[in-house]
């Protein structure tokens, strides 16, 4: 039971960090390449 409580307390923290990093990455891509439907570096 203690392992389940540890998992339930770790998963929201990791998902918050992951989605925060992903949102920051998307914001930075949109800052350097605004409105890019096709990325110019491909």
Swiss-Prot record:
Location within or outside the cell: Plastid, Chloroplast thylakoid membrane
Bilayer-crossing regions: 7-27
Keywords from the UniProt entry: Chloroplast, Membrane, Photosynthesis, Photosystem I, Plastid, Thylakoid, Transmembrane, Transmembrane helix
SUPFAM superfamilies: Subunit IX of photosystem I reaction centre, PsaJ
Top-level taxon: Eukaryota
GO cellular component, one term: photosystem I
Alphabetical list of PANTHER family matching this protein: PHOTOSYSTEM I REACTION CENTER SUBUNIT IX, PTHR36082
Protein's name according to its UniProt entry: Photosystem I reaction center subunit IX
InterPro entries xrefs: PSI_PsaJ (IPR002615), PSI_PsaJ_sf (IPR036062)
Species for this entry: Platanus occidentalis
UniProt membrane topology term: Single-pass membrane protein
Function: May help in the organization of the PsaE and PsaF subunits.
UniProt cross-references to HAMAP family, sorted A to Z: PSI_PsaJ
Gene Ontology biological-process entries: photosynthesis
Main location class: plastid
Similarity section: Belongs to the PsaJ family.
